[in-house]
Amino acid sequence: FREYSEYDLKVRLPNKKIRVIKKIKIPLLGLHNIKNSTAATALALTVGLSISNIKKGLRNFKGVQRRFNKIFTFNNVDFFDDYAHHPTEIKEVLNGVKKVYSNYEKICIFQPHRISRLKDLKAEFASAFKDADKVILFPIYTAGEKIKLGFSYSDFAKEIIKKSKVKLFLVNDKYQLAKYIKYNIYGKKIVIGMGAGSISSWMREMPKFF
């Protein structure tokens, strides 16, 4: 497998000229990263950078923190961290992972961020995990919100199972997560932690529990 995206780009510049760049490579996965790099490429062409320098710069770009960053390996399984906390972001990350790791079981560890966001986008979240095989669901990171959710969290979990057609496990804290990983994560799998709350720091703590 490869942990990069490759694509061709056709750009119409402000002077109406058409430029075509073949086989652009970026060491990042996901449609959202391709969209960002195409915008950067168009700008670079507009200000006069050469195609070779543009391709070199994109090829060597390391990305930003918490955008599909590999954080550790356990039982020969790679664990990644991503800031995705909106249904659209989740879909794009999982779609990119599916294309590259097509023969792997894809496990998403998700921590919803803010009660209000989950209330407003409940249906969108429930169907956002279709490109995963399994979801491990954390309690909501409230970010200080004190409003009521308005529905059962277990019912929300069932809705994810129904709409995204995945297996799902509820965990209450990082200790339950560590136990689950230790005894269940091995073989041909890939694991992505997603969320804008404490999930990132918890994921990075996992190796000390094994």
Predicted stretch roles:
Residues 17-134:
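Nucleotide phosphate-binding/pyrophosphate-handling subdomain across enzymes
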Residues 92, 120-122, 148-149, 182, ...:
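Short amphipathic alpha-helical segments
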Residues 79-81, 168-170, 192-193:
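Short catalytic-loop micro-motif centered on adjacent basic/acidic residues
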Residues 1-22:
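Acidic-glycine-rich active-site phosphate/pyrophosphate-binding loop
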Residues 85, 112-115, 140-143, 196-199:
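Short glycine-rich anion-binding loops that position phosphate/pyrophosphate groups of nucleotides
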Residues 176-207:
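A glycine-rich beta-strand to alpha-helix segment
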Residues 95-98, 123-127, 152-153, 187, ...:
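Short, solvent-exposed amphipathic alpha-helical segments in soluble enzyme
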Residues 126-187:
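C-terminal helical cap/extension that packs against the catalytic core
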